């Protein structure tokens, strides 16, 4: 059994180390309304379509309770739409600064292509957002063969539709000849729901939530503890494999092929 394609996530996986572009904006749109949310809370739904992310935040019990304290009622769909529109407006202005490929990604992509592997991608960003990110990333040397956004399919993650559309456009089947790699719980669910080999990448991920500088300066024991927490979270949510850096991906691929593994 040969792996024929790899489907990559974007922010936190191939670009934007630590997935910081949307984080501050999510926190800001709530803070402006007198509702303080933590970075950990803001990251929890990461990987979803962004309006679904806003909605998921409003449904968290602590945030909903705080909103009720401030406004005397729970968030409405109108509130969600208003916050999402504000989120988009702010995010569009900063996205170009968060499109640089993560260290080592371009080299791994080049190596995969030398093997004849096709490169697809999925995202929680809208098509309009990705027009900005993909253009800037391409200028810096990263351009997958195909990109699918939630706008292109009936629903985003955790549904498998973006992966299926990649498979159709890349001409690869069955789905167990493909790997899905990402940095969030919703990525793991997307890959498993699509029937693909699913890999979670830890360093640079939204789930780890650390900048490169923080990783470099953190006590090794503390960093290892945080890495293992994320690793376990990925596995609990369906990851077949976890890797700390993208450079380990080809080893995983070779293991699948050599051992003739079967998705369970």
From Swiss-Prot:
The UniProt annotation places Mg(2+) binding at: 9, 11, 183
Q: Which GO terms describe its cellular component?
A: cytosol
Q: Which reaction does it catalyse?
A: phosphonoacetaldehyde + H2O = acetaldehyde + phosphate + H(+)
Give, as one word, the top-level EC class.
hydrolase
Q: Is Lipid biosynthesis among this UniProt entry's keywords?
A: no
Give its E.C. classification number. 3.11.1.1
What is any Pfam family matched here? Hydrolase
Q: From what superkingdom does this record's organism come?
A: Bacteria
Kindly state which keywords UniProt assigns to this record, in alphabetical order. Answer: Hydrolase, Magnesium, Metal-binding, Schiff base
Active site, UniProt feature: 9 (nucleophile), 50 (schiff-base intermediate with substrate)
Q: What protein name is recorded for this chain?
A: Phosphonoacetaldehyde hydrolase
Give the organism the record lists: Bacillus cereus (strain ATCC 10987 / NRS 248)
Q: Which gene encodes it?
A: phnX
């Amino acid at each position: 059994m040969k792996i024929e394609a790899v489907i990559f996530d974007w922010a936190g996986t191939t670009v934007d180390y630590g997935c910081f572009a949307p984080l501050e904006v999510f926190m800001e749109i709530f803070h402006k309304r007198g509702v303080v949310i933590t970075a950990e809370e803001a990251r929890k739904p990461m990987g979803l379509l962004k309006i679904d992310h806003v909605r998921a935040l409003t449904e968290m019990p602590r945030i909903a309770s705080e909103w009720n304290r401030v406004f005397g009622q729970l968030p409405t769909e109108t509130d969600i739409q208003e916050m999402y529109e504000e989120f988009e407006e702010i995010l569009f202005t900063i996205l170009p600064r968060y499109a640089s490929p993560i260290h080592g990604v371009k080299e791994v992509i080049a190596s995969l292509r030398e093997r004849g592997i096709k490169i697809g991608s999925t995202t929680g960003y809208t098509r309009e957002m990705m027009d900005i990110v993909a253009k800037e990333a391409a200028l810096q040397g990263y351009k997958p063969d195909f990109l699918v956004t939630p706008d292109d399919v009936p629903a985003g993650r955790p549904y498998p539709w973006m992966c299926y559309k990649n498979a159709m456009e890349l001409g690869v089947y069955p789905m167990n000849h493909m790997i899905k790699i990402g940095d969030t719980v919703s990525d793991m669910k997307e890959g498993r729901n699509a029937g693909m080999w699913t890999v979670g990448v830890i360093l640079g991920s939204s789930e780890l939530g650390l900048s490169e500088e923080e990783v470099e300066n953190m006590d090794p024991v503390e960093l290892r503890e945080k890495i293992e927490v994320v690793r376990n979270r990925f596995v609990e949510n369906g990851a077949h494999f976890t890797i700390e850096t993208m450079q380990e991906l080809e080893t995983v691929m070779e293991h699948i092929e050599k051992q003739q593994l079967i998705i369970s």
